[in-house]
A protein has these predicted regions:
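C-terminal and inter-domain tail/linker signature
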Residues: 1-172
């Protein structure tokens, strides 16, 4: 009985192509011909091969702050899906159009728990759903008042890292 494809390895290759090597062609090779990517809180992403390539080119790959790191929390792998939970940390020293479209750099630090759900067709990524608490990001950037609303700041990321054992960061 064969073990089947290592979807976690495909996930890692995809993320390394996005963040480390910033290689759009390598990123697209990990995906089906007509994938979609959706950053739920910011309403950014694209559907279809050329549109996803355009999104990666204009808003994602090469548009991540230089000091960004991913601190792993957990990963669940099934036969057709990988769910990755991590804390994304960065300094908002450049525009981040996939997360904060139209928001000029504030110079502030951000730490936000993030969940990525990648669905697969065989060994290729068919879709990505990415979730984070946008209110938490806006509070950390000084764009939303915390006091009167039930929102957190970087404390939520700190507590999650404490509870999960605070794994070493991965380059983003």
């Amino acid at each position: 009985m064969s073990a089947g494809p290592d979807l976690g390895a495909v996930f890692d290759e995809h993320v390394a192509s996005e963040f480390e090597t910033q290689d759009i062609d390598a990123t697209m090779r990990t995906m089906v011909d007509e994938p979609y990517v959706w950053h739920v809180p910011a309403l950014t992403g694209a559907s279809g091969g050329e549109a996803v390539r355009g999104f990666y080119t204009s808003q994602f790959i090469g548009h991540t702050p230089a000091d960004a790191v991913l601190r792993p929390i957990s990963r669940t792998v099934s036969s057709d899906r990988v769910v990755d939970e991590f804390v994304l940390e960065f300094t908002h020293d450049a525009e981040v159009p996939f997360m904060l479209p139209g928001v000029p750099p504030t110079g502030r630090k951000v730490r936000v728990p993030t969940v990525v759900v990648m669905g697969f067709e065989g060994q290729k990524i068919a879709y990505e759903h990415i979730y984070w608490d946008q209110a938490t990001v806006l509070v950390q950037l000084g764009l939303l008042e915390r006091g009167s609303l039930p929102v957190a700041d970087a404390d939520e990321a700190e507590r999650l890292l404490e509870l999960a054992g605070g794994e070493e960061p991965l380059p983003a």
